[in-house]
Amino acid sequence: MTTPTPFPVGPAHIVGIGGIGMSGIADVMLTMGYEVQGSDVSDSANVERLRARGVKVFIGHKPENVVGAGTVIISTAIRRDNPEVQAARAAGIPVVRRANMLAEITRLKYTVCVAGTHGKTTTTSLVACLLDGAGIDPTVINGGIIHAYGSNYKAGESDWMVVESDESDGTFAKLHPTCAIVTNIDPEHMDHYGTMDKLREAFDTFVENLPFYGFAVLCTDHPEVQALAARVTDRRRITYGFNLQADVRAVNLSTDLKGAHFDVEIRRGAGEAPRRIEGLTLPMAGEHNVQNALAAITVALELGASDEQISASLASFGGVKRRFTPVGEWLPAAGGEPVKIIDDYGHHPVEIAAVLKAARAMQADRTVIAVCQPHRYSRLKDLFEDFSRCFDQADHVLVAPVYEAGETPIPGITHETLVRSIQRNGHRSARALPSLAELPEVVKTLAGPGAMVVCLGAGDITRYAGELEARLKG
């Protein structure tokens, strides 16, 4: 098999190949001509998709799986004591992080890299959608399933690539984008960074990696990104947001059950009159999603998309799996309007607050029930006070036990202590669920006609959200 390297390097073995990020790397490497194999702890849809492309996937992590591999690729989720990693190092096989391989891949194309604490997956999807609509046909590597593709990956024919970066371990600063998008910067992954100054430095480096012909797209609604914009002195920058001073600004926003409707005001250089793209519709609610759309619109305009192409593509956007995704409806015994069930990946307080604000905008005075499964004890501990105050837009809050994600419990950091803190912060209806198995019966007592149940978390709550309609009807 021909490869994009000047000499044979042997198969690339991807540890955790079924993961959303690693499966995308596998796809693009296959398309480029690399020989790829991998392993994961269990079968999954991504594993089966890769097998259908001819990839050998081992189930279980074992030292013998890496025999004959030319390199081993790992993500931040793979521990140093993983048996395949240990075997590779003992055998002198290079062990490469996902970001390093992504940097190698993106070196060969003009690349739009999306970074930020929140909104990366949706923004990446929107950029891909608008560039597709403009006939640019980029290659796409995303951190979530794009409904239009049925996958987190698309092989494009153009010289452009759109990728979601990963700032969790700082390796996103190794990327060399042509366009660097920064959606927001909040304290997250502080176990790696330690201080906000170190986190800021990583984003500074990410933007400084732009070539002289590249540009940064920065959301100045967020104070940390606005401060970053002020530090960008030798790269071209374009700001976006609701901020009155933004170069690409959303105005006249309204929301209904069909999504967000708004105009975009575009201001170029000093002295140039602003112009507008009017009557845009995004089939997603929430100011945060409009901000994500503004980033995509900015990139599309820079790459030559017409106003008409942008409007049509935005209106047809199919969304991303687990981003305010409707997964069912249930008609209460009282009749009337059905109860809507929403599944969302939000697991950080800022994300939860944004999702619930969007839900409230859609629901008006109808009931919103937030169901939260905290993800990781360490995150709950580090952001405990923020978690205690992010549910104000919900009428009722149900908190399930913490999804451990391999972590050891931390004394005093439980879903019960979170509920007590939510109550102390003034919420009138918050309760702890013994388990998510109790959810259907509790929803039946709280949800009247027209209510919305929003299931939030990065753990297995998505399975319960998907089953909730059937269990309510059963």
UniProtKB/Swiss-Prot annotation:
User: Per the similarity annotation, which family is this?
Assistant: Belongs to the MurCDEF family.
Record gene name = murC
Originating organism = Hyphomonas neptunium (strain ATCC 15444)
> Which HAMAP family does the record cross-reference, listed alphabetically?
MurC
Per UniProt, the keywords (alphabetical) are: ATP-binding, Cell cycle, Cell division, Cell shape, Cell wall biogenesis/degradation, Cytoplasm, Ligase, Nucleotide-binding, Peptidoglycan synthesis
Pathway membership: Cell wall biogenesis; peptidoglycan biosynthesis
Which residues participate in ATP binding?
A: G116, T117, H118, G119, K120, T121, T122
Known role: Cell wall formation.
Please, which domain of life does this record's source organism belong to?
Bacteria
**Annotated InterPro entries:** Mur-like_cat_sf, Mur_ligase_C, Mur_ligase_C_dom_sf, Mur_ligase_cen, Mur_ligase_N, MurCDEF_pg_biosynth, UDP-N-AcMur_Ala_ligase_MurC
Recorded hits in Pfam families, A to Z, give: Mur_ligase, Mur_ligase_C, Mur_ligase_M
Give a GO molecular function annotation for the protein. ATP binding
Identification of the protein by name: UDP-N-acetylmuramate--L-alanine ligase
Give the EC number(s) under which this enzyme is classified: 6.3.2.8
Report which reactions are catalysed by this protein.
UDP-N-acetyl-alpha-D-muramate + L-alanine + ATP = UDP-N-acetyl-alpha-D-muramoyl-L-alanine + ADP + phosphate + H(+)
Location(s), subcellular: Cytoplasm
Query: Which one GO biological process term can you cite for this protein?
Result: regulation of cell shape
PANTHER family (UniProt xref): UDP-N-ACETYLMURAMATE--L-ALANINE LIGASE, UDP-N-ACETYLMURAMATE--L-ALANINE LIGASE-RELATED
Q: Name one GO cellular component term.
A: cytoplasm
| Major enzyme class | ligase
